[in-house]
């Protein structure tokens, strides 16, 4: 099944429609997104890498909603039996993010101050730094962080787009992120155009869209198995979903 990719502008408009006309709150959308991220992490690592084989998941969060999705995912991963830690160098100012932090503190999920040291002990990494609204350029500390992720052998799950990638044109031609190819990618709601440059395990999470939203944006949602919130869709050698 071929899936339609949506632009950053349409993705932002879709989120606005969900909240203004659909009755959804930002909290709800972030919870569903974070749940999808955690399930993609489970699919990517649990069947081949259960908690008994290595529990340490490093969740790297940016200052926006993509980072909030990462905070939610970290909570779910803790409940699944993993040992997540969070690197959150530039915290978002929205009060929602502070509540998510409190939830993690109550589960004794640590917020680590040193990314380089945390990466050394990570078995898996969730890249929740930048999402569909990223427009560049990268600002510190993120160029250094992305360079370290890029050169590490730790498997990575990126949220909505590999951080540093342009949503339309994919990886930068040079500098941090130019060779960044995470092991897995979870597209939230619908794939973004940059996915045609991606090679790896590709998941979609958006099992909450109404018929009216699907029709308005011309989406063709995949069939989700059972009660799963995500589905693996892949990308072929020609960049087609």
Swiss-Prot record:
Compartments in which it is found: Cytoplasm; Mitochondrion
Annotated catalysed reactions: (6R)-NADHX = (6S)-NADHX; (6R)-NADPHX = (6S)-NADPHX
GO molecular function terms attached to this record: metal ion binding; NAD(P)HX epimerase activity; nucleotide binding
Note on cofactor: Binds 1 potassium ion per subunit.
Amino acids binding K(+): 66, 127, 163
Protein name: NAD(P)H-hydrate epimerase
Cofactors, names only: K(+)
Annotated residues for binding of (6S)-NADPHX: 65-69, 131-137, 160
Source taxonomy: Eukaryota, Fungi, Dikarya, Ascomycota, Pezizomycotina
Superkingdom as given in the UniProt entry: Eukaryota
Cross-referenced HAMAP family: NADHX_epimerase
């Amino acid at each position: 099944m071929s899936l339609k990719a949506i632009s950053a502008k349409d993705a932002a408009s879709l989120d606005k429609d969900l909240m203004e006309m659909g009755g959804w709150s930002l909290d709800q959308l972030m919870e569903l997104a974070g749940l999808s991220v955690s399930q993609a992490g489970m699919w990517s690592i649990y069947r081949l890498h259960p908690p008994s084989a290595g529990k340490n998941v490093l969740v790297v969060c940016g200052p926006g909603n993509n980072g909030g999705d990462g905070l939610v995912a970290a909570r779910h991963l803790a409940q699944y039996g993993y040992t997540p830690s969070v690197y959150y160098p530039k915290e978002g100012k929205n009060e929602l993010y502070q509540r998510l932090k409190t939830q993690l503190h109550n589960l004794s999920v640590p917020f680590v101050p040193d990314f380089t040291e945390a990466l050394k002990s990570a078995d898996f990494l969730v890249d929740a730094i930048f999402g569909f609204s990223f427009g560049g350029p990268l600002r510190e500390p993120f160029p250094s962080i992305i360079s370290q992720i890029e050169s590490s052998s730790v498997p990575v799950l990126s949220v909505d787009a590999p951080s540093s990638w342009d949503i339309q044109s994919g990886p930068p031609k040079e500098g941090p992120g130019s060779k960044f190819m995470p092991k897995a990618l979870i597209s939230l709601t619908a794939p973004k155009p940059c996915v045609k440059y991606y090679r790896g395990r590709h998941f979609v999470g958006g099992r909450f869209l109404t018929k009216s939203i699907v029709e308005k944006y011309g989406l063709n949602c995949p069939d989700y198995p059972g009660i799963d919130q995500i589905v693996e869709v892949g990308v072929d050698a020609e960049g087609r979903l």
